[in-house]
Amino acid sequence: IVVALLALNSACSSTNATIRTPAFSGPEQAHTSGAVSRLAVPDNYGGQTTQVYLTGYSYWDNTPPGSAQIARPVIHNRAGGTGTYDDPVTLAVGHVKNGGRSTMDFQAGTRFYIERLRKYAIVEDLCGDGNNPQDGPCHSGYNGRPWIDIYVGGRHSDKTFTTNCMYRITGLQNVIINPNPGLPVSAGELAASGCQVF
């Protein structure tokens, strides 16, 4: 179990660092079975409802490790956020590298609402490494679903606790892309709540 938990670490990066790829990509290591409970969301909250494969990255496994650097700041200068509409949590997404330029799978600034976390999130970081990140799971997705990586924090928690926290949220999750404000929120750092799911 410890090996499986450690394999769940995913990492994202700043523009000055090498971007690392989540350590797993096969269904045999997925945390959830695909059965995802659904929060009742009124139709008037805008956006597109879809399902994504969600992983987490932390202060401890970011690139560089022990930092909150991000590659595409929009609201935050460093990874963070409490999950409210006005202070969404930093998200990392896959990207394609071509001629030294990265094209993100979702544009920087795209907001998501992650139903089981009751958090708004915003794309501000890259997920995937090397010269061909498009060949990795962050870009190619999981079982036909987009892959997003949410920052859980963890600077004030130990590494093992934070890893277990990330494991708890890893799996298929219902999201709303470009949601309106006003959805239920559980504000605060994910790691501080033990990555509580609803």
Q: Which positions does each model-derived feature cover?
A:
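N-terminal export and membrane-targeting signals
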Residues: 1-2
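C-terminal motif of bacterial Sec signal peptides marking the signal peptidase cleavage site
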Residues: 9-11
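Solvent-exposed, well-ordered loop and adjacent helix/strand elements within mature globular domains
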Residues: 16-198
